[in-house]
Amino acid sequence: MNAAPTVLQQQAQSLSEAVTQPIPGSRKIFVQGSRADLQVPMREIALTRTPTLFGGEENPPLSVYDTSGPYTDPRVAIDLAAGLAPLRAQWIAERGDTVALDGLSSSFGRGREHDVRLDAVRFPARRLPRVARQGANVTQMHYARRGIITPEMEYVAIRENQRLEAVTDASLRRQHPGQAFGASIQQRITPEFVREEIARGRAILPNNINHPESEPMIIGRNFLTKINANIGNSAVSSGIAEEVEKLVWSIRWGGDTVMDLSTGKHIHETREWIIRNSPVPIGTVPIYQALEKVDGRAEALTWEIFRDTLIEQAEQGVDYFTIHAGVLLRYVPLTAQRVTGIVSRGGSIMAKWCLAHHKENFLYTHFEDICQIMKAYDVAFSLGDGLRPGCIADANDAAQFGELETLGELTKLAWKHDVQTMIEGPGHVPMQLIKENMDKQLRECGEAPFYTLGPLTTDIAPGYDHITSAIGAAMIGWFGTAMLCYVTPKEHLGLPNRQDVRDGIMAYKIAAHAADLAKGHPGAQVRDNALSKARFEFRWDDQFHLGLDPEKAKEFHDQTLPKDAHKLAHFCSMCGPHFCSMKITQDVRDYAAEHGMSEAQALSTGMQEKSAQFVAQGAQVYRAT
């Protein structure tokens, strides 16, 4: 092994120290499936006993969905230079429909492999890619349509249920009825339901056969709402070690998938490090790398260059590709009257190519050729919205909806090849126009999963667009969007750092959970109920641990009440000891219990006592003291 990977590995040691400790108050557990090698990870939050004053009962631990992979499991030794264990390798091999290649198929990949100048940044462990056998289709959709329940499907069924059956306290399971807008929300997710949804095209299970390290997950409106985090280096900022760190940081806080949007140098090598160390699906926009190969000249792009890029990335293990095949020549003039024109990088690249050659988008004309590649590796389509609105003034215009109609046409073509497909959506949309987007997408695209960037509901808050977009994300998630692409505070301003990534993920975890509550997803309210109970009982540590960001909650509390004794206090610094509404409520309950009366009677008695006291003191509103 050369010295350079060791340098990267040394840089990664700080990553391990910073982000690999368990989430406070919890531990990694595994739920056993039907076979010995099917163990589904979850995070179990330990809860303390209710204080005697409030009843003194035990509070059993609560299991929640976990995206952090082995990084938060202290029993696992992390070696970024070796990558993660190939969790699905045996499942893939057992199906007998893939073969290992002797080497890389793409000409670009082969060139990088033998370039000694790249030794300093190359991932050290060599791995031979796999591909479908001649004439075979290896997509999860293909299996689902043939009635096959794969281990991946069983895995996600167990994962989606979050051990809800272990919650026996009826007060924790209490939940408001949801409004699902026609979604088929199940009380319990079964492997058969997962298979049906994938076969129907309403859900995707993005798992490239060359990314066996990934833990299966599902994207669909009848499942938990997912979020995506974007990372990626650029020509002016960020390197490989930093991007791997951002990957681990993203999944620690709840990123269900991660998109590598790298546009700078060493795109290929950065992606290899990311995929080999990622337990979540990785998405890319292949046109970005294809453009790098022609020195940034969109007009110089060719189908051959793009095809080679697809194969290169598919053999590395990319799980889904954003492909802007709906940017048609006839739609480009429709953007001329927009305030912000075409804001999608991929959309602008393809629009420029179309105008330069005055030909139809080659991604559209070669779409079935692309399908042949996708089904040979089980790469899912994320059909890009290259004409999405870049400001609320441009929302829901002819260009945006024309492209959406074309994406619906392409979805049906992809399904003909059993290729898993989701649809990307806006963007910038005011609140009153959001539902129209969702309804049209369901209608035009046959209920294929919708994957939206926000949408941002106003354009006046640079520096706070994680908030402007989380508002729209919560709404469109409720209406039926399956996955929300996060927006960070740096949106429109610069490349996000680690704190920006965390802030963006938190905003979107809130939006996704709010959507699940509104849809009435089974068990969605359990965690809310558990936290509310802990709050009323002044179990401060449990409040922190049940929150989406335990570290932030504890940090804020300890800024004013830092002592250990304050974790037992029946108040916080907001109201203090004499004005805490929950403490007052408990005092009323205690008074009622002491005097053998109901809470209503206690309140009435207390009011009568105060009335008598007022009259006895002279019935004066103001008294000299």
UniProtKB/Swiss-Prot annotation:
Enzyme Commission code(s) on record: 4.1.99.17
Single GO biological process annotation from the record: thiamine diphosphate biosynthetic process
Binding site for substrate: 230, 259, 288, 324, 344-346, 385-388, 424, 451
Keywords, comma-separated and alphabetical: 4Fe-4S, Iron, Iron-sulfur, Lyase, Metal-binding, S-adenosyl-L-methionine, Thiamine biosynthesis, Zinc
Residues noted as binding [4Fe-4S] cluster in the record, renumbered to the chain: 572, 575, 580
Task performed by this protein: Catalyzes the synthesis of the hydroxymethylpyrimidine phosphate (HMP-P) moiety of thiamine from aminoimidazole ribotide (AIR) in a radical S-adenosyl-L-methionine (SAM)-dependent reaction.
GO molecular function: 4 iron, 4 sulfur cluster binding; carbon-carbon lyase activity; zinc ion binding
Record organism: Xanthomonas euvesicatoria pv. vesicatoria (strain 85-10)
UniProt pathway annotation: Cofactor biosynthesis; thiamine diphosphate biosynthesis
HAMAP family for this protein: ThiC (MF_00089)
Pfam families per the UniProt record, alphabetical: ThiC-associated, ThiC_Rad_SAM
Cofactor detail note: Binds 1 [4Fe-4S] cluster per subunit. The cluster is coordinated with 3 cysteines and an exchangeable S-adenosyl-L-methionine.
The protein's name: Phosphomethylpyrimidine synthase
Stretch forming the signal peptide: none
UniProt binding sites for Zn(2+): 428, 492
GO cellular-component term (any): cytosol
Record family assignment: Belongs to the ThiC family.
Subunit note: Homodimer.
InterPro entries per record: ThiC (IPR037509), ThiC-associated_dom (IPR025747), ThiC/Bza_core_dom (IPR038521), ThiC/BzaA/B (IPR002817)
Co-factor(s): [4Fe-4S] cluster
Gene name in the database record: thiC
Enzyme class: lyase
